[in-house]
């Protein structure tokens, strides 16, 4: 059974069948449905190698997992965004290639090599860091890519994100509105844009309420429970506070553990607010108040943007800001 047999029975040219196999956006839905039905009836299922030869593509997209999540598969953000990416990639017949790294330099080179060697047709970056060197190189080379996050540089790129600064500001304003005046902040790795943005939201909320930032109440943490635990231990040595804003749920859960070990009643004596509203927050005691970020949707939209860029459809640049909201539970 060959592609010509499918074309003859479907009443189209072999090149049209090839484009249907590639899920080309310029082929009408009716034609795609008719060709796919004939393929199913004939038992014609082109493998990935055959599709690659037809399309001059790899039928794969890369997911670049930076050191933000390196060694941290326990963070629910990562599987949630991958699930969103996978759900749309599957519909396009695309495989995922996951790239990890031990350094920023290795991360950049691995990503570029994936594209240069045509092992992937485009990449999704799960984070950007300060003074990012990879994004300018990707943009200059014309490689298809999408960033989940915010980019500080001048290059015009495709991105999808939530308003981390504005969302953090709302979360801290919520605490200030409940009467807290000594609000501590557990920020993430300062090399990452997401950490800087959420810390900026903390600063803005304090300023709008006429409060100055006390450096003793700001600690940086790894994006992990242990990181939040250790950062809170340092906070407890630095001064008094009645609330903690943590830029990630795992950091917040670590903070709660450190407070509870000291006999502090979380939610009554000290309020704790997290960020991302991952599934773990609903199961700690008390349940965690957190900023809900549509993580799954971030992954879905990133693939939609990337496939549009690869296939030359849609608009460029495509930039979307998703809405987040505060989910109030027992911790604050």
Pin down the residues of each PLM region:
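N-terminal helix-turn-helix DNA-binding module of bacterial transcription factors
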Residues: 1-59, 332
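Bacterial carbohydrate/catabolite-sensing allosteric modules
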Residues: 9, 41, 84-92, 139-147, ...
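Residues at secondary-structure transition points
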Residues: 26, 30, 48, 52, ...
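Short gly/ser/thr-rich secondary-structure transition/capping motifs
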Residues: 41-47, 104-107, 128, 256
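Alpha-helical recognition/docking segments in bacterial nutrient-uptake
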Residues: 60-64, 68-173, 177, 235-236
């Amino acid at each position: 059974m060959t592609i010509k047999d499918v074309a003859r029975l479907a009443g189209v040219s072999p090149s049209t069948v090839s484009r249907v196999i590639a899920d080309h956006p310029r082929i009408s839905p009716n034609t795609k449905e008719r060709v796919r039905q004939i393929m199913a009836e004939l038992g014609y299922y082109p493998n990935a190698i055959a599709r690659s030869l037809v399309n001059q593509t790899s039928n794969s997209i890369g997911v670049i997992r930076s050191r933000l999540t390196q060694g941290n598969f326990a963070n629910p953000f990562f599987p949630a965004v991958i699930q969103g990416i996978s759900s749309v990639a599957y519909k396009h017949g695309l495989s995922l290639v996951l790239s990890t790294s031990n350094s920023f330099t290795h991360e950049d080179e691995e990503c570029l090599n994936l594209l240069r060697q045509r092992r992937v047709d485009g990449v999704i970056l799960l984070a950007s860091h300060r003074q990012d060197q990879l994004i300018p190189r990707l943009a200059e080379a014309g490689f298809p890519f999408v960033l989940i996050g915010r980019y500080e540089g001048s290059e015009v790129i495709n991105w999808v994100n939530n308003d981390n600064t504005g969302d953090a500001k709302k979360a801290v304003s919520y605490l200030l509105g409940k009467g807290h005046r000594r609000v501590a902040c557990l920020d993430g790795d300062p090399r990452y844009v997401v950490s800087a943005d959420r810390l900026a939201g903390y600063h803005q909320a304090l300023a709008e309420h006429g409060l100055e930032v006390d450096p003793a109440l700001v600690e940086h943490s790894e994006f992990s429970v242990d990181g939040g635990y250790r950062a809170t231990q340092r906070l407890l040595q630095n001064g008094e506070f009645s609330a903690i804003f943590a830029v990630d749920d795992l950091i917040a859960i670590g903070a709660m553990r450190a407070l509870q070990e000291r006999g502090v009643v979380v939610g009554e004596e000290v309020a704790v607010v997290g960020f991302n509203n991952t599934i773990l927050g609903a199961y700690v005691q008390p349940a965690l108040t957190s900023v809900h970020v549509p993580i799954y949707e971030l992954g879905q939209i990133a693939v939609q943007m990337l496939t549009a860029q690869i296939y030359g459809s849609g608009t460029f640049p495509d930039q979307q800001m998703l809405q987040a909201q505060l989910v109030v539970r027992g911790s604050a």
